[in-house]
Amino acid sequence: MLGKSQFDDLFEKMSRKVAGHTSRRGFIGRVGTAVAGVALVPLLPVDRRGRVSRANAAESAGDPRGKWKPQDNDVQSCDYWRHCSIDGNICDCSGGSLTSCPPGTKLASSSWVASCYNPTDKQSYLISYRDCCGANVSGRCACLNTEGELPVYRPEFGNDIIWCFGAEDDAMTYHCTISPIVGKAS
């Protein structure tokens, strides 16, 4: 076993050897590269196709949402497949449609997105939820669906935010939400 002084001598010799063969700038550059690389990890693409099968397979007795099955018949129903992540009122019940606001309301320029599964063609689609603003809440067809919802620190996937701050003419009062298809998600 090495004594204390032998250990100190060995460590000092190795430290001096490493210091003699490397520069401070090189070390700082490598640390900077590592920090930048770690910061860029959240920007990498992620394959979430497995989430659809897990979401549809979830059958929880304590969770009423566990039995939620998307359907493709009644667009004014909360379980219509495009409404998988809607948190608000469906515009189709207020004189609008899946893609247009009711008369007297303005379309907000901001949106949030979700990937919803269509049971008819067994495909997932990217839905861009946009709020219609400028009239009082209709109260008809109110839905609280949270399929694929993420916490508020990812606001582009957050359905708890009222997105009327981008509407024309300062129409800040929420009325309903439309759900147009952006494209295929998978």
Swiss-Prot record:
Q: Which residues carry this modification: Tryptophylquinone?
A: 112
**GO CC list:** outer membrane-bounded periplasmic space
Q: Which reaction does it catalyse?
A: 2 oxidized [amicyanin] + methylamine + H2O = 2 reduced [amicyanin] + formaldehyde + NH4(+) + 2 H(+)
Family annotation (Gene3D superfamilies):
Methylamine/Aralkylamine dehydrogenase light chain (2.60.30.10)
* Leading EC class: oxidoreductase
Please report any disulfide bonds recorded for this protein chain, giving both cysteine positions: 78-143, 84-116, 91-176, 93-141, 101-132, 133-164
Q: Which range is the signal sequence, renumbered to this chain?
A: 1-57
Crosslink feature (Tryptophan tryptophylquinone (Trp-Trp)) location: 112-163
Keyword set, alphabetical order: Disulfide bond, Electron transport, Oxidoreductase, Periplasm, Signal, Transport, TTQ
Q: Which cofactors is this protein said to need?
A: tryptophan tryptophylquinone residue
UniProt feature coiled coil, ranges: none
Q: What is its EC number?
A: 1.4.9.1
What GO molecular function annotation could you give as one example from this UniProt entry? Answer: aliphatic amine dehydrogenase activity
Pathway per its UniProt entry is: One-carbon metabolism; methylamine degradation; formaldehyde from methylamine: step 1/1
Any GO BP: amine metabolic process
Cofactor info, note text: Uses a protein-derived tryptophan tryptophylquinone (TTQ) cofactor.
Annotated compartments: Periplasm
Where does it primarily localize?
A: periplasm
Q: How is it modified after translation?
A: Predicted to be exported by the Tat system. The position of the signal peptide cleavage has been experimentally proven.
What interactions and quaternary structure are annotated?
Answer: Heterotetramer of two light and two heavy chains.
As for what it does, the entry says: Methylamine dehydrogenase carries out the oxidation of methylamine. Electrons are passed from methylamine dehydrogenase to amicyanin.
**Similarity-based family:** Belongs to the aromatic amine dehydrogenase light chain family.
Give the protein's recorded name. Answer: Methylamine dehydrogenase light chain
